[in-house]
Amino acid sequence: AYLPDFSFFMDGGENAVAKSKESVEYSILGAADAVSKLSPDFIAFQEVDLDGTRSYHINQFELLQSEFTEYSSNYAVDYDSAFLAYPIFEPHGKNKACLATFSCFEMDSALRRSLPISTSFTKVLDLDRCYSIVRIPVENGKELCLYNVHLTAYGGNDEVRKGQLSMLYNDMETDYKAGNYVI
């Protein structure tokens, strides 16, 4: 939901909130347009705001649904911050975001899996990390398993990252060994 000149505070930049409500809508609709031109069977988005100070309280998931009306969709909340008071002069604020998965095939089920996160102070930047597994039935009786993943990007340590990758790998391997197709 950010324009190219946005410099995100977590990457050493200065911005925590989009420039305007219009810039959020422009960015989301632009991303949707770029993706739709590819005519994908599946789409996986991360950092999709359901509500948030940083995105002027625009429900980006609903905005994407309005652009991909022929797709079934699902979301899993992966960030729910009551209020992040940083940066001091333009706080990130209250935000709730998700992983959003879209499919041109009907989804049979979806599961949200919570990932291990840091227990240190950095966990305020890393709330609710997860992945979602969407299951789509296949004609041979197996399932196509779509994994939409958002691992720890900031804070944490190697042990947390290894734990996240191990959990993800184990779930993917279980699906694969069951004869399912894993993406």
Range-by-range predicted roles:
Residues 1, 46-48, 76-79, 105, ...:
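Active-site-proximal beta-strand/loop segments in catalytic clefts of secreted hydrolases
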Residues 130-147, 159-183:
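His/acidic metal-ligating clusters that form di-metal
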Residues 1-96, 142:
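N-terminal, active-site-proximal structural segment of metallo-dependent hydrolase catalytic domains
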